[in-house]
Amino acid sequence: MTQKYWEKKPTSFKEMVQLVEKYLQTEIVRETKDKQLYYHNLNHALAVKRRANSIFQAIKPALSQNHSLQELTRLESLIDICGLAHDMVQVFEPTSSNLSRKRLSGLSETETANKLLRYIQELNQALSTEKSAPTFLFSDREQQIIRDAIIATICIQDPQGSKTKTTFFSYSIYQPYLYDPQTKISLVGSIIALADLGALGMDGVEAYIQDGILVFLEDNPYLLELVLNCDRPNSLAPDVTKAKLLTMARFIVDLAHERQARFEQEIAGFMPQMRQILRNQVFIYLNQDSINQVKTLVPNQSSASLSELISFFCSNKIKTIST
C-alpha cells in the first residue's frame, strides 16, 4: 500500500508536505490537459502560492508574538499547500463547443477540497501503519484549515451589483468568505483568498491584464485562434465578437476598480498592525496609478473597434501560453 504514496518513507512533516505538493502538481497538470485550462493551471497555482507566501512572510513578525516557531512553520506549509491546491479541480457545466463555458459557483472548490483531503487522509493512514510519529501527520485541525482555505476562494456575483459603494457593475464578483464576520479557523483562509485575486495589487498591471485575457480564453476556448493569431472566428458575426470582447475588456477594467475599493473591507479581519503591513509592503500596486494604467491599456469604450479589441486580446504577452 505504501508504495502507492512514496518511494522513500517520509521522516518528517516537511517531507509529508513535499509528497502532497508533488501530488498536487501532477493532478493540476493532468486537469489542465484534460480540460484545456489556460488560466487555472500550474502557472496560476504557483503564482497564488507565491503571493500567499509573500503575505505570510510580511505579517510573520506580528504573528510570532502569539505563535511559536513550530506553529508558524506548520502554518506556512499549510499556506503553501492551499495556494497550490485551491483550483486543482475545475468543473464546467455541459455546453456546446462554440459557447462560453460556465461553472457552478463553489462546486470546483468543494471538489478540490474533497479530493485533496481524501489524499491526505489516505497518506496519514498509510504512514500510521508504519508507526511514524503523530507529528508527521496532518492533524484534524490542519485538515479543517485546508478545507476552510480552499472554500475561502469561492467567488460569487454580488447580489447588490452596482447598488453598493464598493462595486461598479451589475455582475460584480467577490469572495464572501472575507466579508463573513464570524471568527475564522485561522488566517490561512484569508491569506489564500487575498492571494487568489491579488495579481493587480501584488504583481502589477501587466500580470493582471494577462490573467484577464487567460480567463477569457479559458471560458471561450473556441476563440483560441483569435487570441493566438488574431483570427476572427467565422462562426461568429462581427458584432457578436465585438460584444463578447468588449464585455470582457470592461470586466477587466471594472474589476481593477473593485479590487481597490474592496481592499479595506477584505483585510478588516487582520490585526491593525498587519493591515498596515498589507497596505504598505504587500499590495503595493493597488492604487489609482494602476487603475489608470489598466483603463489606458484596455480598450473598454463603446467606440472601440473590433480590430482594436482583437489586437488587445491577441497580445504578445499571451504568445507563450501552453496549448
For every predicted segment, state its role.
Residues M1-T95, K102:
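Acidic/His-rich, divalent-metal-binding segments that scaffold phosphate/diphosphate chemistry
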Residues Q90, P94, R118-T129, A152-P159, ...:
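Alpha-helix capping at helix-to-loop junctions
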Residues T2-K8, S54-L75, A85, V89, ...:
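Divalent metal-dependent phosphate-bond-processing catalytic cores, especially two-metal-ion Mg2+/Mn2+ enzymes
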Residues A62-S77, I81, L123-I154:
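Acidic/histidine metal-binding catalytic segments
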